């Protein structure tokens, strides 16, 4: 739930979409859907949209990941379209949600930037849950890690683990 409060989840989804679909980040619009019913949407060249909707429950994507490519009977209630009434969408404010801005910077930076952003976020959230930093410090620390010059360039798998460790260490050193 904390990832949703900082919009780090949206930043990680952006990184994921850039990697999986080979799209530049500018082609991906991030919006906040407050009812948490619309989980993803794709707009095609004819401007039609296909969206994935469902009740807000992480058991759905976890179940699908475990049973792919089959769709098995769900363990969550059906989505009641009549009860929805309205779906609202807001532009994600990157000044308020610094984790999202940091993820965009990490993509542009390339190399291990996305790994550093993730490691920094996990460490900052841990420190927040331990009452060692304030909520707004999470975004500040993730941005500081991404803005540092430590995490660019080519890399190996062992570099990924080292980057994660160093990002967490950086966060602890910059409390």
Predicted region positions:
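Catalytic, metal-anchored helix/loop core of enzyme active sites in primary metabolism
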Residues: 1-175
């Amino acid at each position: 739930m904390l990832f949703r409060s900082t919009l780090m989840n949206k930043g990680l989804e952006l990184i994921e979409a850039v990697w999986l679909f080979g799209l530049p980040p500018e082609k991906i619009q991030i919006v906040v859907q407050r009812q948490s019913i619309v989980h993803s949407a794709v707009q095609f060249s004819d401007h039609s949209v296909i969206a994935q909707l469902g009740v807000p429950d992480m058991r759905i994507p976890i179940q699908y990941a475990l049973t792919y490519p089959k769709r098995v009977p769900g363990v969550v209630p059906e989505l009641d379209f009549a009860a929805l009434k309205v779906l609202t969408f807001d532009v994600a404010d990157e000044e308020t949600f610094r984790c999202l801005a940091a993820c965009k910077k990490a993509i542009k930076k390339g190399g291990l930037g996305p790994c550093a952003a993730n490691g920094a976020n996990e460490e900052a959230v841990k420190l927040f849950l331990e009452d060692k930093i304030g909520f707004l410090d999470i975004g500040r620390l993730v941005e500081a890690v991404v803005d540092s010059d430590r995490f660019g360039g080519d890399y190996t798998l062992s570099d990924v683990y080292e980057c994660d460790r160093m990002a967490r260490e950086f966060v602890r050193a910059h409390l």
